[in-house]
């Protein structure tokens, strides 16, 4: 916290989270997709957002690459920068969930501690950790951006899964098999959202 924090006061507003959720017709939550590069995080999150949008659900997808074009464009890939990247995304996701949106985030977010901090910021009742579990060998075969090839050749350092660690979730709320069809995974997630009374249809 900064030194001037004693002069910064939280202001409550008359429009509550519950009122916003009532307007949207569903709860505001954060769906946090985590997994290796190439695991299918962004693909599944994008397909789920499309399915929710077709059902009239208010959503927003925060993608790991996209936020580095603006919100996090000043950050690199050191451990400190990765931590700050996730902290910023967590803050934005929390604000969007407060606005009543279903926020989908697709980030490697390799460290458990960082994901836990986001969970605490968002609130345990509004944070759903979704682990897209895809074997490293499959991720390397997919390699949509050619990053694994560069990492194996020594052209890309500190790459998660090769020379930087990925800490898989101990007990994610959702554990997806990243080798399954995307349509099957989306169906599983829609069922979960219905069971938890996050969406109605």
Curated annotation (Swiss-Prot):
Q: What keywords appear on the UniProt entry?
A: ATP-binding, Kinase, Nucleotide-binding, Phosphoprotein, Transferase
Q: Where does ATP bind?
A: 35-42
Q: Carries keyword Transcription?
A: no
What's a Gene Ontology MF term here? adenylylsulfate kinase activity
Its Enzyme Commission number(s) read: 2.7.1.25
Which SUPFAM superfamilies does this one have?
Answer: P-loop containing nucleoside triphosphate hydrolases (SSF52540)
What is the top-level taxon of the source organism?
Bacteria
A GO term (biological process) for this protein?
sulfate assimilation
Q: Which PANTHER family match?
A: ADENYLYL-SULFATE KINASE 1, CHLOROPLASTIC (PTHR11055:SF63), BIFUNCTIONAL 3'-PHOSPHOADENOSINE 5'-PHOSPHOSULFATE SYNTHASE (PTHR11055)
Record family assignment: Belongs to the APS kinase family.
Q: What is this protein called?
A: Adenylyl-sulfate kinase
